[in-house]
């Protein structure tokens, strides 16, 4: 990651292009991945004196769904999901305008987890936590959208919107949104 970032910054410098802000996925997600990404972004912002923009991981996952064929229904809801092991997912319920219907939380998925939404709307589930939940959810209004992962390229429109709106983070005090506390475990194999 460091080499790629260095090359990108060299490209900007060699072409006289300004850097005004750095956007980073702020979570939820992998503890290590979030720490590395946020630390790199904060270092660039501090070193270059530019703004920091944080984009929630689940929101950036919604971009390709909204740009694709789904959802067709005007009142449909979308639910990006990240696998949190076993039958647990990190999920958020959004409308088609990316307005939060239900904030991000850790859900232990059973047949009733999203029933209140499914009884009134078509609901599109996607992300690496969605497939394992579909059999359990089993509702005629539940739809699985496959192949959606959190990709940096989907961050651009959301980061630009935050830039225009002046929604920046404090570089010194910003921390990723882990959702759950980190629990250290002893390795199964000791060296």
Task: Briefly describe each language-model feature range.
Residues 1-5, 41, 152-156:
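A general structural signal for well-ordered alpha-helical segments in protein cores
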Residues 8-12, 47, 65, 152-163:
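Stable alpha-helical structural segments in soluble proteins, enriched in small hydrophobic residues
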Residues 1-28:
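N-terminal beta-alpha supersecondary unit
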Residues 51-150, 178, 183-184, 188:
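Surface "functional belts" at beta-alpha junctions
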Residues 14-18, 72-74, 169:
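Short helix-terminating capping/connector loops at secondary-structure junctions
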Residues 145-191:
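Acyltransferase
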Residues 23-57:
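DPxDG-like acidic metal-binding loop motif
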């Amino acid at each position: 990651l460091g080499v790629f970032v260095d090359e990108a910054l060299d490209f900007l410098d060699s072409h006289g292009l300004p850097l005004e802000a750095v956007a980073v996925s702020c979570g939820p997600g992998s503890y290590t991945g979030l720490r590395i990404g946020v630390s790199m972004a904060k270092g660039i912002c501090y070193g270059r004196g530019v703004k920091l923009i944080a984009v929630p991981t689940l929101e950036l996952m919604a971009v390709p769904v909204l740009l694709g064929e789904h959802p067709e229904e005007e009142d449909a809801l979308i639910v990006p999901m990240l696998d949190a092991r076993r039958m647990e997912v990190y999920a958020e319920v959004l409308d088609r305008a990316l307005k939060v219907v239900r904030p991000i939380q850790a859900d232990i998925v059973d047949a009733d987890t999203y029933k209140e939404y499914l009884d009134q709307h078509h609901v599109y589930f996607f992300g690496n936590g969605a497939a394992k939940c579909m059999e359990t959810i089993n509702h005629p209004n539940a739809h699985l959208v496959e192949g959606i992962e959190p990709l940096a390229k989907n961050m651009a429109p959301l980061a630009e919107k935050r830039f225009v709106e002046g929604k920046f983070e404090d570089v010194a005090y910003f921390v990723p949104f882990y959702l759950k506390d980190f629990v250290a475990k002893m390795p199964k194999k000791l060296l």
